[in-house]
UniProtKB/Swiss-Prot annotation:
Keywords: Amino-acid biosynthesis, ATP-binding, Cytoplasm, Kinase, Nucleotide-binding, Threonine biosynthesis, Transferase. It comes from the Bacteria. Catalyzes the ATP-dependent phosphorylation of L-homoserine to L-homoserine phosphate. GO terms for biological process: threonine biosynthetic process. This is Homoserine kinase. It is an enzyme of class 2 (transferase). It comes from Campylobacter jejuni subsp. jejuni serotype O:2 (strain ATCC 700819 / NCTC 11168). Its EC number is 2.7.1.39. Belongs to the GHMP kinase family. Homoserine kinase subfamily. Pathway: Amino-acid biosynthesis; L-threonine biosynthesis; L-threonine from L-aspartate: step 4/5. InterPro entries: GHMP_kinase_C_dom, GHMP_kinase_C_sf, GHMP_kinase_N_dom, GHMP_knse_ATP-bd_CS, Homoserine_kinase, Ribosomal_Su5_D2-typ_SF, Ribsml_uS5_D2-typ_fold_subgr. The gene is thrB. One of its GO terms (cellular component) is cytoplasm. ATP binds at residues 84-94. It catalyses: L-homoserine + ATP = O-phospho-L-homoserine + ADP + H(+).
Amino acid sequence: MKILVPATSANLGPGFDCLGLSLKLFNETQIQKSGVFSISIGGEGSDNIFLKKNNIFVNIFYEIYEKLSGKKDNFRFIFQNNIPLSRGLGSSSAVIVGAIASAYYMSGFKVEKECILDEALIYENHPDNIAPATLGGFVCSLVEKNKVYSIKKEIDKDLAAVVVIPNLAMSTEQSRQALAKNLSFNDAVFNLSHASFLTACFLEKKYEFLKFASQDKLHEINRMKNLPELFEVQKFALENKALMSTLSGSGSSFFSLAFKDDALALAKKIQTKFKDFRVQYLEFDDNGFEIC
């Protein structure tokens, strides 16, 4: 079997831990039953020995597979990782979702996306990345009694993303330590209103309001202080036809959304100005993970 799992960008400014969308940048994993266990890694993380010795995908896969099938089989895993690691593009969610869905498939169980999403919550306790990685599109999610509830909206084909990827790894745990311990009532109301309005903008295609709807007072500023150049990236993107520009997940990547006609030019301009960063033009994925 082969499974493709997309990269994701979460939070989208004010939608902390509840909003996310799916990008056409995929981790690809092939799994075959084998007489002996083996693992091969290409792309991102291919030079990381730890990923071979203690691979999270493999660990979760075997845990779920043995629980479902009652068997202890050996498998050959071939990874082609295209999602940058620890850059705020959902690399850990792609691993979790991919491992669970693969285990269900190889165990002979029906792969139901709602079931996969609830199972993924065991390994990642916020749904902002795992939901779009599973469902695709723009997704608003919440957790109620250990169950994920999500509403998905397909993203217009005339929109595209420009993702700026610094050479700075940043784990979610590390990034959360930078968050303020207390929040004022006014700032809480600010984020609630902006996250709600941002969601409505995607649902009703009111893209002209995204620039101010995507503002945040909860997490972005504190996280971006780890890499001050990101403030310049955001300002530059918004001055050059980005409809919105936000920290991607916990960082360090930065996500901008624009009309396709503007996005490619924006990517080139950002790459010219910020030569030390990797810049990618990406379209949006509306399917979530796919088993081939």
